């Protein structure tokens, strides 16, 4: 660890914090229907879309109608993406002549991109046509991210409104998230990435002659436009198989910094949106402080582990940190920071190979996934995810003082706690049950690339990534098989929709309750005591569940490494 490394980390955190208030203020105006500078340009387009769709922007929906709208929209996107892949060979914009995709992989990819996971059991530049990349994956990158933002805003309304029955209009929230938040930012980012050297073309792959006289095919395509929403929407699926480690997706330190900021920008700003909409910005800062505490702890441990390196390599006389699987242009500091950011959010993009991290360095990204992607998390998804833990923390505090728990004047009762626990527990169920089956199923074990505890970690990481809708992987696992394509797809759907529906049910329940004025006995939720309680709840409820599994994987691998054994 070096002073320069810590300085880079502090600069990143400082810039991110500077973005929170202005972006949060802008998003608040967007979702409360106030005019913004972009309203003069995008307002007519927005109203035109409502007329075409037959949507009345003033008509709000009950939580069940909101949920059904979201589920039907997701189903339509799933089917469209599935059939685009199945008929890829017959469709235009396929200059490389890519063949159609099989049913199992098409199912996995459709589930992956609709759920904002972007798990990739394929190499983009060698498998997918331009049409599928643009009309399929990039479109889903936008709408899956917009769906997450819409759902977070709906849940915020449940706390911010004194009483009512409706939580908003899904179609309006989806449209505004896309038009006013994602699209403008992505246009600017795309232009910046093109300036930095990221390709953006519909032309065919380039054939080149190397210095040795051999022929080489250089994959290009509409990379920059997909890269922008891949990061801002915390999608993570790369145009290239190497993802953001590829020089065409991440040319230099500037592009790397922009991508890291984009991953956290909207998720962090949503805490400010929450504070503004409930009328007390300290509430939002308290939640961001809890997220930040866990994030900084993860960065410290990962950076320390990777900078310390591998003692087995040191024994050979090679000193220094662990550079295996890392790009020299980023080094240990930016690779470690990127790994924690991408797994703290539900992004999954990587600028280095996580499976090549040390056992402890790789365990932190795994823990981030298993906590349920609540450390900033995906756009929208991270915020409604951490609100589930907020409800549980408030319930625990109520038990300790012997009074009915309240949060922002809304009584937290049995229904809300049950729904929150359902949302929290469905993730470890999906992660652990399918991991247990896979380690005893011969066809699943055959896909492991490394023996011993690291092989177990590869499987555990795969299902943790799928359930958390992250998409990153310990790439030693050969997951493009029928078993993994189907089961990982199912786990992705569980991790997305068995969290969303309970969250919307909570929104519907809370919005119907009248706001109760704060009293002397009300537990303060905007100070350090609440931050500590929330962090403790996340670690105990979300973290201890996985300790036995972690003991079988990265912990025993680390102890074995110290004892002189590698896997």
Swiss-Prot record:
The keyword Transmembrane helix belongs to this UniProt entry's keyword annotation: yes
GO cellular component terms attached to this protein's record: plasma membrane
Classification via Pfam families: KdpA
Subcellular location(s) of the protein: Cell inner membrane
One MF term in the entry's GO annotations: potassium ion binding
Domain of life of the native organism: Bacteria
Keywords recorded for this protein, A-Z: Cell inner membrane, Cell membrane, Ion transport, Membrane, Potassium, Potassium transport, Transmembrane, Transmembrane helix, Transport
Membrane topology: Multi-pass membrane protein
Stretches that traverse the bilayer: 5-25, 64-84, 136-156, 179-199, 254-274, 285-305, 328-350, 375-395, 421-441, 459-481, 486-506, 529-549
Known function: Part of the high-affinity ATP-driven potassium transport (or Kdp) system, which catalyzes the hydrolysis of ATP coupled with the electrogenic transport of potassium into the cytoplasm. This subunit binds the periplasmic potassium ions and delivers the ions to the membrane domain of KdpB through an intramembrane tunnel.
Subunit structure: The system is composed of three essential subunits: KdpA, KdpB and KdpC.
NCBIfam families given in the database record: kdpA
Record-linked PANTHER family: POTASSIUM-TRANSPORTING ATPASE A CHAIN, POTASSIUM-TRANSPORTING ATPASE POTASSIUM-BINDING SUBUNIT
Family: Belongs to the KdpA family.
Protein name: Potassium-transporting ATPase potassium-binding subunit
Species: Rhizobium rhizogenes (strain K84 / ATCC BAA-868)
Taxonomic placement: Bacteria, Pseudomonadati, Pseudomonadota, Alphaproteobacteria, Hyphomicrobiales
């Amino acid at each position: 660890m070096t002073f320069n490394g810590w300085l880079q980390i502090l600069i990143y955190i400082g810039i991110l914090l500077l973005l929170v208030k202005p972006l949060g203020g802008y998003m608040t105006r967007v979702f409360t229907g106030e005019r913004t500078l972009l309203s003069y340009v995008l307002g007519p387009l927005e109203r035109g879309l409502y007329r075409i769709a037959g949507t009345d922007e003033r008509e709000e929906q009950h939580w069940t109608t909101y949920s059904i709208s979201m589920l039907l929209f997701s189903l339509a996107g799933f089917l469209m993406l599935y059939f685009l892949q199945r008929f890829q060979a017959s469709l235009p914009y396929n200059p490389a002549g890519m063949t159609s995709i099989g049913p199992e992989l098409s199912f996995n990819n459709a589930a992956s991109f609709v759920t904002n996971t972007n798990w990739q059991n394929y190499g983009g530049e060698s498998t997918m046509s331009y049409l599928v990349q643009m009309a399929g994956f990039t479109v889903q990158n936008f709408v899956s991210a917009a769906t997450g933002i819409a759902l977070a805003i709906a849940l915020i309304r449940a706390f911010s409104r004194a009483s009512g029955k409706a939580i908003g209009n899904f179609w309006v929230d989806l449209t505004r998230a896309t038009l006013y938040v994602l699209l403008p930012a992505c246009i600017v980012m795309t232009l910046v990435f093109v300036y930095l050297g990221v390709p953006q073309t519909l032309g065919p792959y380039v054939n080149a002659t190397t210095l040795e006289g051999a022929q080489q095919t250089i994959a290009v395509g509409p990379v920059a436009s997909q890269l922008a929403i891949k990061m801002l929407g915390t999608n993570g699926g790369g145009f290239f198989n190497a993802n953001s480690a590829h020089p065409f997706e991440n040319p230099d330190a500037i592009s790397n910094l922009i991508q890291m900021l984009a991953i956290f920008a909207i998720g962090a700003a949503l805490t400010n949106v929450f504070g503004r909409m409930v009328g007390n910005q300290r509430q939002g800062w308290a939640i961001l402080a809890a997220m930040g505490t866990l994030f900084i702890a993860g960065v410290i441990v990962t950076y320390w582990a990777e900078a310390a390196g591998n003692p087995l390599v040191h024994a050979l006389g090679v000193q220094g940190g662990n550079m295996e699987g890392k790009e020299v242009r980023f080094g240990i500091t930016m690779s470690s920071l990127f790994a924690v950011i991408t797994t703290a959010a539900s992004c999954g993009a990587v600028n280095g190979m996580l499976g090549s991290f040390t056992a402890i360095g790789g365990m932190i990204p795994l823990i981030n996934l298993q906590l349920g992607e609540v450390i900033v998390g995906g756009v929208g998804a991270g915020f409604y995810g951490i609100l589930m833990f907020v409800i549980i923390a408030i319930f625990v505090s109520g038990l300790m003082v012997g009074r009915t728990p309240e949060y922002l004047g809304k009584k937290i009762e049995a229904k809300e706690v049950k729904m929150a626990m359902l949302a929290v527990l469905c993730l470890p169920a999906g992660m652990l049950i399918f991991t247990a089956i896979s380690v005893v199923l011969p066809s699943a074990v055959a896909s492991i690339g490394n023996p011993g505890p690291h092989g177990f970690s590869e499987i555990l990481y795969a299902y943790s990534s799928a359930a958390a809708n992250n998409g990153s992987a310990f790439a030693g696992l050969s997951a493009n098989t029928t078993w993994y394509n189907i089961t990982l797809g199912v786990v992705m759907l569980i991790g997305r929709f068995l969290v969303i529906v309970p969250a919307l049910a909570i929104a519907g329940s809370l919005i119907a309750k009248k706001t109760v004025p704060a009293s002397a006995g009300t537990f303060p939720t905007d100070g350090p005591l609440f931050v500590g309680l929330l962090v403790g709840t996340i670690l105990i409820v979300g973290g201890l569940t996985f300790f036995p599994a972690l003991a079988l994987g990265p912990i025993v691998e680390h102890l074995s490494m110290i004892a002189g054994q590698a896997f």
